[in-house]
Design a protein with these regions (language model features):
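Hydrophobic transmembrane alpha-helices and their helix-loop junctions in integral membrane proteins
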Residues: 1-202, 207
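Cytoplasmic/organellar membrane-interface segments at the starts of transmembrane helices
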Residues: 140-143, 193-256
Length: 256
Protein backbone atom coordinates (compact mmCIF):
# COMPACT_ATOMS: atom_id res chain seq x y z
CA UNK A 1 0.00 0.00 0.00
CA UNK A 2 3.02 2.29 0.23
CA UNK A 3 5.57 1.28 -2.37
CA UNK A 4 3.47 -0.37 -5.09
CA UNK A 5 1.66 2.79 -6.31
CA UNK A 6 5.06 4.49 -6.73
CA UNK A 7 6.50 1.40 -8.39
CA UNK A 8 3.59 1.34 -10.82
CA UNK A 9 4.02 4.99 -11.81
CA UNK A 10 7.79 5.44 -12.05
CA UNK A 11 8.83 2.88 -14.72
CA UNK A 12 7.78 2.63 -18.33
CA UNK A 13 4.33 1.20 -19.01
CA UNK A 14 5.73 -2.12 -20.26
CA UNK A 15 7.71 -2.61 -17.04
CA UNK A 16 4.70 -1.57 -14.97
CA UNK A 17 2.38 -4.04 -16.70
CA UNK A 18 4.86 -6.91 -16.19
CA UNK A 19 4.99 -5.99 -12.52
CA UNK A 20 1.21 -5.63 -12.12
CA UNK A 21 0.16 -8.60 -14.24
CA UNK A 22 2.92 -11.10 -13.46
CA UNK A 23 5.46 -10.30 -10.74
CA UNK A 24 3.01 -9.49 -7.93
CA UNK A 25 1.56 -12.97 -8.40
CA UNK A 26 4.80 -14.50 -7.09
CA UNK A 27 3.71 -13.78 -3.52
CA UNK A 28 0.37 -15.41 -4.26
CA UNK A 29 2.13 -18.51 -5.59
CA UNK A 30 4.43 -18.65 -2.56
CA UNK A 31 1.47 -18.40 -0.16
CA UNK A 32 -0.48 -21.11 -1.98
CA UNK A 33 2.54 -23.38 -2.21
CA UNK A 34 3.61 -23.01 1.42
CA UNK A 35 0.45 -22.46 3.43
CA UNK A 36 -2.10 -24.42 1.42
CA UNK A 37 -0.06 -27.25 -0.09
CA UNK A 38 2.94 -27.82 2.20
CA UNK A 39 1.70 -26.72 5.62
CA UNK A 40 -1.75 -26.42 7.10
CA UNK A 41 -1.97 -23.04 8.82
CA UNK A 42 -3.84 -22.74 12.15
CA UNK A 43 -7.45 -21.62 12.00
CA UNK A 44 -6.67 -18.38 13.85
CA UNK A 45 -4.00 -17.47 11.30
CA UNK A 46 -6.36 -18.33 8.47
CA UNK A 47 -8.98 -15.95 9.85
CA UNK A 48 -6.34 -13.25 10.29
CA UNK A 49 -5.32 -13.55 6.63
CA UNK A 50 -8.98 -13.31 5.59
CA UNK A 51 -9.36 -10.07 7.55
CA UNK A 52 -6.12 -8.63 6.13
CA UNK A 53 -7.13 -9.56 2.59
CA UNK A 54 -10.50 -7.83 2.95
CA UNK A 55 -8.94 -4.72 4.51
CA UNK A 56 -6.27 -4.65 1.80
CA UNK A 57 -8.86 -4.77 -0.97
CA UNK A 58 -10.99 -2.03 0.60
CA UNK A 59 -8.14 0.37 1.43
CA UNK A 60 -6.56 0.02 -2.01
CA UNK A 61 -9.92 0.49 -3.73
CA UNK A 62 -10.52 3.61 -1.65
CA UNK A 63 -7.10 4.90 -2.72
CA UNK A 64 -7.98 4.35 -6.37
CA UNK A 65 -11.27 6.23 -5.93
CA UNK A 66 -9.54 9.47 -4.87
CA UNK A 67 -6.48 9.24 -7.15
CA UNK A 68 -6.19 11.18 -10.43
CA UNK A 69 -2.99 9.76 -11.96
CA UNK A 70 -4.13 7.07 -14.40
CA UNK A 71 -1.17 4.75 -13.76
CA UNK A 72 -1.42 5.24 -10.02
CA UNK A 73 -5.11 4.31 -10.13
CA UNK A 74 -4.25 1.07 -11.89
CA UNK A 75 -1.49 0.39 -9.35
CA UNK A 76 -3.94 0.79 -6.47
CA UNK A 77 -6.31 -1.45 -8.40
CA UNK A 78 -3.65 -4.14 -8.54
CA UNK A 79 -3.30 -4.06 -4.74
CA UNK A 80 -7.06 -4.37 -4.38
CA UNK A 81 -7.34 -7.29 -6.78
CA UNK A 82 -4.42 -9.14 -5.18
CA UNK A 83 -6.37 -8.83 -1.94
CA UNK A 84 -9.26 -10.54 -3.73
CA UNK A 85 -6.97 -13.40 -4.75
CA UNK A 86 -5.60 -13.79 -1.22
CA UNK A 87 -9.16 -13.73 0.07
CA UNK A 88 -10.05 -16.84 -1.90
CA UNK A 89 -6.87 -18.64 -0.88
CA UNK A 90 -7.34 -17.78 2.80
CA UNK A 91 -10.97 -18.96 2.83
CA UNK A 92 -9.33 -22.22 1.77
CA UNK A 93 -12.20 -24.31 0.46
CA UNK A 94 -12.05 -25.75 -3.08
CA UNK A 95 -14.57 -23.27 -4.51
CA UNK A 96 -12.78 -20.17 -3.24
CA UNK A 97 -9.32 -21.50 -4.11
CA UNK A 98 -10.50 -22.30 -7.66
CA UNK A 99 -11.77 -18.73 -7.99
CA UNK A 100 -8.45 -17.30 -6.82
CA UNK A 101 -6.37 -19.43 -9.16
CA UNK A 102 -8.65 -18.61 -12.08
CA UNK A 103 -8.49 -14.91 -11.26
CA UNK A 104 -4.69 -14.97 -11.45
CA UNK A 105 -5.10 -15.63 -15.18
CA UNK A 106 -8.07 -13.33 -15.74
CA UNK A 107 -6.54 -10.43 -13.85
CA UNK A 108 -3.25 -10.84 -15.70
CA UNK A 109 -4.95 -10.54 -19.09
CA UNK A 110 -7.19 -7.62 -18.17
CA UNK A 111 -4.68 -5.62 -16.13
CA UNK A 112 -2.05 -5.94 -18.85
CA UNK A 113 -4.60 -4.51 -21.28
CA UNK A 114 -5.47 -1.65 -18.93
CA UNK A 115 -1.84 -0.67 -18.37
CA UNK A 116 -1.09 -0.77 -22.10
CA UNK A 117 -4.17 1.34 -22.84
CA UNK A 118 -3.00 3.82 -20.21
CA UNK A 119 0.43 3.83 -21.85
CA UNK A 120 -1.08 4.59 -25.26
CA UNK A 121 -3.11 7.46 -23.77
CA UNK A 122 -0.07 8.90 -21.97
CA UNK A 123 2.09 8.55 -25.08
CA UNK A 124 -0.51 10.34 -27.19
CA UNK A 125 -1.48 13.14 -24.79
CA UNK A 126 1.69 13.57 -22.69
CA UNK A 127 -0.62 13.71 -19.67
CA UNK A 128 -1.31 11.37 -16.76
CA UNK A 129 -3.93 13.38 -14.87
CA UNK A 130 -7.33 12.04 -15.94
CA UNK A 131 -8.92 15.44 -15.18
CA UNK A 132 -6.91 16.96 -18.04
CA UNK A 133 -8.20 14.45 -20.58
CA UNK A 134 -11.59 13.83 -22.15
CA UNK A 135 -13.37 12.85 -25.34
CA UNK A 136 -10.59 10.56 -26.55
CA UNK A 137 -13.06 7.95 -27.75
CA UNK A 138 -13.54 10.19 -30.79
CA UNK A 139 -9.89 9.98 -31.82
CA UNK A 140 -8.85 6.69 -30.16
CA UNK A 141 -11.90 4.39 -30.49
CA UNK A 142 -10.07 1.04 -30.44
CA UNK A 143 -8.06 2.00 -27.37
CA UNK A 144 -11.24 3.18 -25.63
CA UNK A 145 -13.16 -0.02 -26.42
CA UNK A 146 -10.24 -2.21 -25.36
CA UNK A 147 -9.92 -0.30 -22.09
CA UNK A 148 -13.64 -0.70 -21.41
CA UNK A 149 -13.62 -4.46 -22.05
CA UNK A 150 -10.58 -5.03 -19.82
CA UNK A 151 -12.15 -2.82 -17.13
CA UNK A 152 -15.35 -4.88 -17.26
CA UNK A 153 -13.30 -8.05 -16.71
CA UNK A 154 -11.53 -6.59 -13.66
CA UNK A 155 -14.87 -5.37 -12.31
CA UNK A 156 -16.29 -8.87 -12.76
CA UNK A 157 -19.13 -8.31 -15.19
CA UNK A 158 -20.51 -11.29 -17.15
CA UNK A 159 -19.70 -12.89 -19.50
CA UNK A 160 -16.06 -11.86 -19.13
CA UNK A 161 -13.46 -14.00 -17.41
CA UNK A 162 -13.26 -11.91 -14.26
CA UNK A 163 -16.92 -12.59 -13.49
CA UNK A 164 -16.56 -16.35 -13.06
CA UNK A 165 -13.44 -16.12 -10.90
CA UNK A 166 -14.87 -13.48 -8.56
CA UNK A 167 -18.15 -15.38 -8.37
CA UNK A 168 -16.29 -18.50 -7.22
CA UNK A 169 -14.43 -16.54 -4.54
CA UNK A 170 -17.69 -15.07 -3.21
CA UNK A 171 -19.47 -18.45 -3.37
CA UNK A 172 -16.57 -20.02 -1.51
CA UNK A 173 -16.82 -17.41 1.24
CA UNK A 174 -20.55 -18.09 1.57
CA UNK A 175 -19.95 -21.86 1.75
CA UNK A 176 -17.46 -21.21 4.55
CA UNK A 177 -20.16 -19.23 6.41
CA UNK A 178 -18.11 -16.05 5.96
CA UNK A 179 -21.12 -13.99 4.92
CA UNK A 180 -19.55 -10.71 6.00
CA UNK A 181 -16.51 -11.51 3.84
CA UNK A 182 -18.73 -12.13 0.81
CA UNK A 183 -20.58 -8.87 1.46
CA UNK A 184 -17.36 -6.84 1.69
CA UNK A 185 -16.03 -8.57 -1.44
CA UNK A 186 -19.16 -7.44 -3.29
CA UNK A 187 -18.70 -3.92 -1.94
CA UNK A 188 -15.10 -3.94 -3.17
CA UNK A 189 -16.36 -4.94 -6.62
CA UNK A 190 -18.71 -1.94 -6.55
CA UNK A 191 -15.78 0.36 -5.67
CA UNK A 192 -13.80 -1.23 -8.51
CA UNK A 193 -16.61 -0.44 -10.92
CA UNK A 194 -16.74 3.15 -9.67
CA UNK A 195 -13.06 4.04 -10.05
CA UNK A 196 -12.56 2.26 -13.38
CA UNK A 197 -15.70 3.80 -14.87
CA UNK A 198 -14.53 7.16 -13.51
CA UNK A 199 -11.29 6.73 -15.44
CA UNK A 200 -13.14 5.73 -18.60
CA UNK A 201 -15.59 8.62 -18.29
CA UNK A 202 -12.97 11.33 -17.67
CA UNK A 203 -10.48 10.03 -20.24
CA UNK A 204 -12.65 8.88 -23.13
CA UNK A 205 -16.05 10.57 -22.76
CA UNK A 206 -17.18 14.17 -22.61
CA UNK A 207 -15.59 17.16 -24.30
CA UNK A 208 -12.44 16.60 -26.35
CA UNK A 209 -9.74 18.49 -24.42
CA UNK A 210 -6.63 17.13 -26.14
CA UNK A 211 -6.39 16.07 -29.77
CA UNK A 212 -4.59 12.73 -29.66
CA UNK A 213 -4.72 10.38 -32.66
CA UNK A 214 -4.85 6.60 -32.39
CA UNK A 215 -1.38 5.10 -32.15
CA UNK A 216 0.26 2.63 -34.51
CA UNK A 217 -1.48 -0.67 -35.38
CA UNK A 218 1.18 -2.62 -33.49
CA UNK A 219 0.42 -0.74 -30.25
CA UNK A 220 -3.36 -0.78 -30.63
CA UNK A 221 -3.33 -4.37 -31.87
CA UNK A 222 -1.80 -5.66 -28.64
CA UNK A 223 -4.48 -4.12 -26.41
CA UNK A 224 -7.18 -5.30 -28.81
CA UNK A 225 -5.88 -8.87 -28.57
CA UNK A 226 -5.79 -8.70 -24.76
CA UNK A 227 -9.36 -7.39 -24.69
CA UNK A 228 -10.40 -10.18 -27.06
CA UNK A 229 -8.71 -12.78 -24.84
CA UNK A 230 -10.60 -11.39 -21.83
CA UNK A 231 -13.86 -11.97 -23.71
CA UNK A 232 -12.90 -15.42 -24.99
CA UNK A 233 -11.71 -16.44 -21.52
CA UNK A 234 -15.24 -15.84 -20.30
CA UNK A 235 -17.01 -17.70 -23.10
CA UNK A 236 -14.58 -20.63 -22.96
CA UNK A 237 -13.89 -20.58 -19.22
CA UNK A 238 -14.29 -24.37 -19.03
CA UNK A 239 -10.87 -24.85 -20.64
CA UNK A 240 -8.76 -22.98 -18.06
CA UNK A 241 -11.05 -24.34 -15.34
CA UNK A 242 -9.82 -27.86 -16.08
CA UNK A 243 -6.28 -26.84 -15.14
CA UNK A 244 -7.55 -24.77 -12.20
CA UNK A 245 -9.54 -27.70 -10.80
CA UNK A 246 -6.53 -29.98 -11.16
CA UNK A 247 -4.34 -27.49 -9.29
CA UNK A 248 -7.02 -26.98 -6.64
CA UNK A 249 -7.26 -30.73 -6.05
CA UNK A 250 -3.54 -30.90 -5.27
CA UNK A 251 -3.37 -27.66 -3.27
CA UNK A 252 -6.31 -28.51 -1.02
CA UNK A 253 -5.37 -32.15 -0.44
CA UNK A 254 -5.56 -31.70 3.34
CA UNK A 255 -9.25 -30.76 3.14
CA UNK A 256 -10.17 -34.25 1.95
Amino acid sequence: HTWLPDAGVAPTTVTALLHAAVLVKIGVYAYARLFLYTFKIPAAWQQAVIIMAVISSLIAAAGAVVENDIKRILAYSTISQIGYIFLGLSVANPTAVSGSLLYILMHGLAKAGLFLCAGIVIHSTNKRDIREMGGLIRTMPMTAISFLICAFSVIGLPPLGGFFSKLLVIMGAIKANQIWVAALALFTAILTMYYLMRVFSLVFLGELKVSAPEKTPSMVGVVTVLALFSVLAGFFVSYPMKLVQLATTHITWWLR
